[in-house]
Swiss-Prot record:
CDD domains on file: HisRS-like_core (cd00773)
Designated name of the protein: ATP phosphoribosyltransferase regulatory subunit
Note: This function is generally fulfilled by the C-terminal part of HisG, which is missing in some bacteria such as this one.
InterPro entries xref list: aa-tRNA-synth_II/BPL/LPL, HisRS-like_core, HisRS/HisZ, HisZ
GO MF entries: catalytic activity, acting on a protein; histidine-tRNA ligase activity; transferase activity
UniProt-annotated location(s): Cytoplasm
Gene3D superfamilies: Bira Bifunctional Protein, Domain 2
Keywords: Amino-acid biosynthesis, Cytoplasm, Histidine biosynthesis
Length: 320
């Protein structure tokens, strides 16, 4: 009987979990409002084109009574792009939000398909000021959530984007390469470079090892490529990390970091802990997102904190 069962990836949150997650969402939301972020709420349902140009198997879709194809939102940043493009909201502006997002995972992976997020978007400000503001607000939000042990992990979208843009290979091969990079599959990457040789062979083969302390990672990466776009991205990362060294306790690089959203255009970052594999925070720059909605390019950066992941990390230490 389906009356008493839940769809794949959906879960009831009872008692302790429900209360603690509510308190985390509330505390972060109040903190961000006090820091000058403008609270925004967007619909759970949108036209599917807001999130993707094509129908995605990772999104939940349904038709309304007029036959329009809708999506349960898989992220909130795309909705902010729509708001900026379709309203008279003036920039520069800083938004904060919280709410549910939905993304379909295959049943055998055992992952949740519904998550609660809290996050921010900083639009139209000077790039370096916006980056610092975003990262420091993320640090403050993590503190407000009760999380103590974590590290920031940085990368740059132009690194992998440049590799993929210059590989003249089928889409199926690009998807295969994405999987190898994501899984840090050393054997798979070696075999791939033999099947599809390119100027990026050395860099592709070493991607699983371009992780850890920033100075060593940057030094090694520069020895593997002469491509100017990638070298510029490495310089951007180096300059930023030098500025952030005092503000953020533990910083690492992972140049094989796959963009959590397709619209990232520069700096990307995630926050991880030791207890669970999922990122607590994912964020980055997305200056070109607004062009999808017919608006001009704007400097923009944001992050989303996964409250479900934070709860998994801290619940053992919370008395109920």
């Amino acid at each position: 009987m389906k009356k008493t069962s839940l769809p794949v990836g959906m879960h009831d949150k009872l008692f302790k979990r429900a209360r603690v997650m509510y308190e985390i969402e509330r505390d972060i939301s109040n903190l961000l409002i006090k820091q000058g972020f403008n609270r925004i709420e967007t619909p759970t349902l949108e036209h599917f084109e807001v999130f993707a140009d094509d129908v995605s198997s990772e999104h939940y879709h349904l038709f309304d009574k007029k036959g329009n194809l809708l999506s349960l939102r898989p992220d909130i940043t795309s909705q902010i792009g729509r708001v900026i493009a379709s309203t008279r909201v003036e920039t520069p502006i800083k938004f904060s939000y919280s709410g549910k997002v939905f993304k379909y995972n295959e049943e055998l992976r055992g992952l949740a398909n519904e998550h609660t997020q809290a996050g921010i978007e900083i639009v139209g400000y000077k790039t370096q000021d916006a980056i610092k503001d975003a990262l420091l607000s993320a640090k403050d939000a993590l503190k407000a959530s009760g999380l103590k042990d974590y590290k920031f992990e940085f990368s740059h979208a132009h690194i992998l984007q440049t590799i993929f843009a210059n590989l003249d290979i089928p889409e199926t091969a690009k998807k295969e390469l994405t999987t190898f990079i994501q899984d840090k599959n050393i054997t798979g990457l070696n075999e791939f470079t033999h099947r599809y040789p390119s100027e990026f062979n050395a860099l592709i083969r070493q991607l699983p090892f371009l992780f850890g302390e920033s100075h060593q990672v940057l030094k090694k990466a520069r020895q593997l490529t002469n491509h100017q776009t990638i070298l510029s991205a490495l310089t951007d990362l180096e300059d930023l990390l030098q500025e952030l060294a005092v503000s953020l306790a533990e910083i690492t690089l992972d140049l094989a970091q796959i963009a959590s959203m397709p619209y990232y255009t520069g700096l990307m970052f995630k926050v991880f802990g030791d207890k669970i594999p999922d990122a607590f925070v994912s964020g980055g720059r997305y200056d070109k997102l607004f062009e999808r909605f017919g608006a001009k390019e704007l400097t923009a950066i944001g992050w989303a904190l996964d409250i479900d992941s934070v709860y998994q990390a801290i619940h053992d230490h919370i008395r109920f």
